[in-house]
From Swiss-Prot:
This is Acyl-CoA wax alcohol acyltransferase 2. It comes from the Eukaryota. It is a multi-pass membrane protein. Its main location: endoplasmic reticulum. The chain crosses the membrane at residues 15-35, 38-58, 130-150. It comes from Mus musculus (Mouse).
Length: 333
C-alpha cells in the first residue's frame, strides 16, 4: 500500500492553497447566485436574499473606507503553504519610518500578481517584521467587492478598492504608517507577461503619481523578479483574427484575454497552476514627493519620469542576481 510522505502532503497543501485563492472568486460568485436564485424561486425564504442585499447596500462603501481586515486571516497557516509553493521572498533595501504614509508600486503585474498578493495581503512572508509599524493595504479592482461573501473574504486580507476615493481616505483618515500597495500595470500588462519579459505598461499610468503629489506621500518602487516566469503564454500573430479580437475585447472591457498555461496537479503535467519558480520582490527606497494639491500635467509628468528613473535604478542594481543579463533593460510601454 502507498502511504504519502510528509513531502507529498506538503506539496498537496501548497497546491490546495493556490487553488483555493485562484478559484475563490469563481466558486463564491457561482454559489451566491445559485443559492439566492433557489431561495427566491423555489422556497419561501426569499427574505434571506432581501436581507443580504440590504446589508450589501448598507456596507457598500466599506471597501473605500479602509476595508475590514482580520489579522487572524492574514496569518492563516494556509498562506504559508501558498508562499512556499514558489517560494516567495521579499528583500528590503531601506528602512522606512512609520511616521509617514507611502504608496508602494509593485511591478510587474504578471498574469495573476501572485507575489504581490503573497507579500502584502498576507503576513506569511514576514511583512510585519520587515516593516515594523507599517500597515499594508493591497488595493485591487472594485469588482471584487460587488458580491456578498467574496467582498468580505477579500477585505479580510486587508485589501481595499483601488479607486481614487479609497486612496484619498486611506491617506487622510487613517493616520500615519500606512502603505498603499498598487500594481499599476494592471490587466493591461498581462499581454506582455512571458517568461523572461521585462516589459512594463507604465507610460500612461500616472494616476498614482498625481495621488502621491496631492497628499505629499513618498512613492516606493518594488520589482518582483520571476513573476513573469510563472506562466507560459501563446502570443498570436500580430494583426491576425485572434489578436484583433484580443485588442477589441480589451478596448471594450479593459481586460486583455490571454492564452496562458502553467503546470497541472503534478509538476510535469499541463494546467493552470503557476510553475513552482522562486519569485523575489525587491522593495526600493522611498522617493519623496512634495505636497501639491492640484498638480499640473507637467508636474505629474516630471515626477512620473523621476519615478521611472528610480525603478530603472532598482532593476539594474539587482537584475543580475536573478538570472537577468547585464545588457537586458527594463522596457516601458
Amino acid at each position: 500500500m502507498f502511504w504519502p510522505t510528509k513531502k507529498d502532503l506538503k506539496t498537496a497543501m501548497e497546491v490546495f492553497a493556490l487553488f483555493q485563492w485562484a478559484l475563490s472568486a469563481l466558486v463564491i460568485v457561482t454559489t451566491v447566485i445559485i443559492v439566492n436564485l433557489y431561495l427566491v424561486v423555489f422556497t419561501s425564504y426569499w427574505p434571506v436574499t432581501v436581507l443580504m442585499l440590504t446589508w450589501l447596500a448598507f456596507d457598500w462603501k466599506t471597501p473605500e473606507r479602509g476595508g475590514r481586515r482580520f489579522t487572524c486571516v492574514r496569518k492563516w497557516r494556509l498562506w504559508k503553504h501558498y508562499s512556499d509553493y514558489f517560494p516567495l521572498k521579499m528583500v528590503k533595501t531601506k528602512d522606512i519610518s512609520p511616521d509617514r504614509n507611502y504608496i508602494l508600486v509593485c511591478h510587474p503585474h504578471g498574469l495573476m500578481a501572485h507575489s504581490c498578493f503573497g507579500h502584502f495581503a498576507t503576513d506569511t512572508t514576514g511583512f510585519s517584521k520587515t516593516f515594523p509599524g507599517i500597515t499594508p493595504y493591497m488595493l485591487t479592482l472594485g469588482a471584487f467587492f460587488w458580491v456578498p461573501f467574496l467582498r468580505d473574504y477579500v477585505m479580510s486580507t486587508g485589501s481595499c478598492s483601488v479607486s481614487r476615493s479609497s486612496m484619498d481616505f486611506l491617506l487622510t483618515q487613517k493616520g500615519t504608517g500606512n502603505m498603499l500597495v498598487v500594481v499599476v500595470g494592471g490587466l493591461a500588462e498581462c499581454r506582455y507577461s512571458t517568461p523572461g519579459s521585462t516589459t512594463l505598461f507604465l507610460k500612461k499610468r500616472q494616476g498614482f503619481v498625481r495621488t502621491a503629489l496631492k497628499h505629499g506621500v513618498s512613492l516606493i518602487p518594488a520589482y518582483a523578479f520571476g513573476e513573469t516566469d510563472l506562466y507560459d503564454q501563446h502570443i498570436f500573430t500580430p494583426g491576425g483574427f485572434v489578436n484583433r479580437f484580443q485588442k477589441w475585447f480589451q478596448k471594450m472591457v479593459h481586460i486583455y484575454p490571454c492564452a496562458f498555461y502553467g503546470r497541472g496537479l503534478t509538476k510535469n503535467s499541463w494546467g493552470l497552476l503557476p510553475y513552482s519558480q522562486p519569485v523575489t520582490t525587491v522593495v526600493g527606497e522611498p522617493l519623496p514627493l512634495p505636497k501639491i494639491e492640484n498638480p499640473s500635467e507637467e508636474i505629474v509628468a516630471k515626477y512620473h519620469t523621476l519615478y521611472i528613473d528610480a525603478l530603472r535604478k532598482l532593476f539594474d542594481q539587482h537584475k543580475t542576481k536573478f538570472g537577468i543579463s547585464e545588457t537586458q533593460e527594463l522596457v516601458i510601454v
